[in-house]
Amino acid sequence: FDTPLQWPMLTHWLHNMDQDNALSMLCSLDFVNNKQDKVKIIFVPCYLNGNDGIFNIPYYDLILGNDLCVYPSYYEPWGYTPLEAVAFSIPCITTDLAGFGIWAQHVLAYEKAENSLENGVKVVHRTDYNYHEVADEIRDAVANYALLTKTQVAKAREKARNLSKKALWKKFIAYYEDAYDMALRKAEERTK
């Protein structure tokens, strides 16, 4: 094919393309996948279930092909995607607006480990008002990760996997059982 697509970074037409925030931002930043561009964007706005028409590979198989995952969440009560990444030994960047990011910060602080991709996860502070700082911090983290040696990357991947093991359900269930017990006791007190 020698005729470029109208939107060369987009794999699927969107219902309201002119109102899509991600596509609008890509266009405003002139990410159009020119030959000379060092960064190429593949925007796949669909559920990766193995029948998306582009990859045709289930999400969990596709994630294994990543060197690094970036999930700059604005809000997620827990945020499974960063946890899924580290469970597959893929270091990731997330934010402190995702429950996983908050939890990972606490784990890193408890272990007196630096908040960096070399430790498997980088948690970026995000608010309503620091968009550019978040973008800069993510850019710097990705650039620094690209400079790591193969040995350092292997260690980061191992640390990512080890972090995920601390988030196994068998480790968290006790907290849910305690909360459930507390709720039952309080409900019982109210009915007396």
Could you describe each region identified by the protein language model?
Residues F1-D61, V123:
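Nucleotide-activated donor-binding/catalytic signature segment of Leloir-type glycosyltransferases, i.e.
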Residues C46, K165, D181:
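Residue-level marker of positions within ordered structural domains that often coincide
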Residues F55, G65, C69, A156-R157, ...:
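Conserved, well-structured beta-alpha core segment at the onset of a catalytic domain
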Residues I57, L64, A135-D140, K170-A174:
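A structural signal for well-ordered alpha-helical segments within the folded catalytic domains
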Residues Y60-P77:
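Acidic donor-binding loop of glycosyltransferase active sites
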Residues P72-S164:
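Catalytic binding pocket for nucleotide-activated donors in carbohydrate/polymer assembly enzymes
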Residues W169-K192:
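C-terminal alpha-helical cap of glycosyltransferases
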